[in-house]
């Protein structure tokens, strides 16, 4: 066991009475998700010693980090990315989104299955497979996972120049990302594809974690509820996001429904330049409006892929304008 100054957290945990026994695997995660097992904090601490000061015994006698502490969550992510994905350098600004990695990995793996469903159940891999990450942020999570798991190359876009500067540092310090992740700034805050997608560029899929809320007040209220559930009874009027996030990452006019509806509308102009457009949808109540928008633009095929992490259920919606014949031609040209 690793020792922790000033007191061994594992020793404290092991001596606690009524230690709760947790299942060895997290329910609901994709079979290929590297994070199905419970966190091995011994192994993570070897990979990232900076995590050690943030480890402490829980009320159940287990070892964990304080998920209400943004710095602890950031250090856990840093350890996970180094241990599982070989990322030697990873740092993000204090106010940037620090997403839970297991859920993000699930999106990537289910997206791989979506591509495989059009390719004889074989996942297309390698640098020929190009993906567009809308809102890549400073964290670069989707490109990191997609490159490590499937060898895909990515273009990541964002409206925040500071986030892109941090992302560029992550790319420059990790050899595996230097030739597989290209970053572009979206200079029009009202545009999604326009301005960052060249006329001749083709993508096998897009992915996006859209802003969830419709206002800053709504985002703050959600954070207060999360902190209350985590046992933080004294919550400030302006609470700190435990997973971080700037305004542009957390909310936009119209919220999730408005953002994805605009994405659907813009996708028409790129109909023949992309196989699958996709976006996470956090609120189930958002789905009817998105389906309506997709019927309006006459998408040829629409799929909703459900995902689960414990009791939390999420999904992403995927749509394509390619006919079956066009899909077959795309596969033969790019995935063979």
From Swiss-Prot:
<dbReference type="Pfam" id="PF05971">
    <property type="entry name" value="Methyltransf_10"/>
</dbReference>
<dbReference type="GO" id="GO:0005737">
    <property type="term" value="C:cytoplasm"/>
</dbReference>
<dbReference type="InterPro" id="IPR029063">
    <property type="entry name" value="SAM-dependent_MTases_sf"/>
</dbReference>
<keyword id="KW-0808">Transferase</keyword>
<comment type="function">
    <text>Specifically methylates the adenine in position 1618 of 23S rRNA.</text>
</comment>
<dbReference type="GO" id="GO:0070475">
    <property type="term" value="P:rRNA base methylation"/>
</dbReference>
<dbReference type="InterPro" id="IPR016909">
    <property type="entry name" value="rRNA_lsu_MeTfrase_F"/>
</dbReference>
<protein>
    <recommendedName>
        <fullName>Ribosomal RNA large subunit methyltransferase F</fullName>
        <ecNumber>2.1.1.181</ecNumber>
    </recommendedName>
</protein>
<keyword id="KW-0698">rRNA processing</keyword>
<comment type="similarity">
    <text>Belongs to the methyltransferase superfamily. METTL16/RlmF family.</text>
</comment>
<dbReference type="GO" id="GO:0052907">
    <property type="term" value="F:23S rRNA (adenine(1618)-N(6))-methyltransferase activity"/>
</dbReference>
<keyword id="KW-0489">Methyltransferase</keyword>
<keyword id="KW-0949">S-adenosyl-L-methionine</keyword>
<dbReference type="InterPro" id="IPR010286">
    <property type="entry name" value="METTL16/RlmF"/>
</dbReference>
<keyword id="KW-0963">Cytoplasm</keyword>
């Amino acid at each position: 066991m690793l020792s922790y100054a000033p007191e061994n957290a594992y020793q404290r945990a092991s001596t606690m009475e009524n230690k709760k026994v947790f299942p060895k695997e997290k329910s609901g995660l994709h079979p290929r998700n590297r994070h199905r097992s419970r966190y091995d904090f011994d192994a993570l601490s070897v990979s990232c010693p900076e995590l050690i000061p943030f480890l402490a015994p829980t009320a159940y006698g287990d070892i964990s980090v304080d998920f209400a502490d943004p710095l602890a969550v950031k250090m856990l992510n840093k350890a996970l990315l180094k241990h599982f994905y070989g990322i030697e350098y990873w740092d993000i600004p204090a106010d940037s989104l620090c997403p839970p990695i297991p859920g993000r990995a699930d999106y990537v793996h289910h997206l791989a299955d979506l591509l495989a469903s059009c390719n004889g159940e074989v996942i297309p891999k390698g640098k020929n497979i190009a993906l567009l990450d809308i809102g890549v942020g400073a964290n670069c999570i989707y490109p990191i996972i997609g490159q490590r798991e499937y060898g895909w190359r990515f273009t990541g876009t964002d409206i925040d120049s500071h986030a892109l500067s941090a992302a560029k540092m992550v790319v420059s310090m990790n050899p595996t990302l230097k030739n597989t992740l290209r970053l572009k700034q979206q200079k029009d805050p009202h545009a999604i594809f326009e301005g960052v997608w060249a006329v001749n560029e083709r993508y096998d899929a897009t992915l996006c974690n859209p802003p969830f809320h419709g206002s800053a007040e709504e985002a703050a209220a959600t954070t207060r509820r999360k902190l209350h559930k985590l046992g933080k009874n004294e919550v400030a009027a302006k609470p700190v996001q435990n997973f971080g996030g700037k305004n542009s990452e957390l909310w936009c006019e119209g919220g999730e429904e408005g953002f994805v509806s605009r994405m659907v509308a813009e996708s028409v102009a790129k109909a023949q330049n992309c196989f699958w457009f996709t976006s996470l949808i956090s609120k189930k109540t958002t789905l009817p409006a998105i389906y309506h928008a997709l019927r309006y633009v006459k998408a040829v095929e629409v799929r909703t892929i459900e995902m689960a992490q414990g009791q939390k259920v999420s999904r992403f919606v995927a749509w394509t304008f390619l006919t079956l014949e066009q899909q077959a031609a795309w596969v033969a040209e790019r995935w063979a």
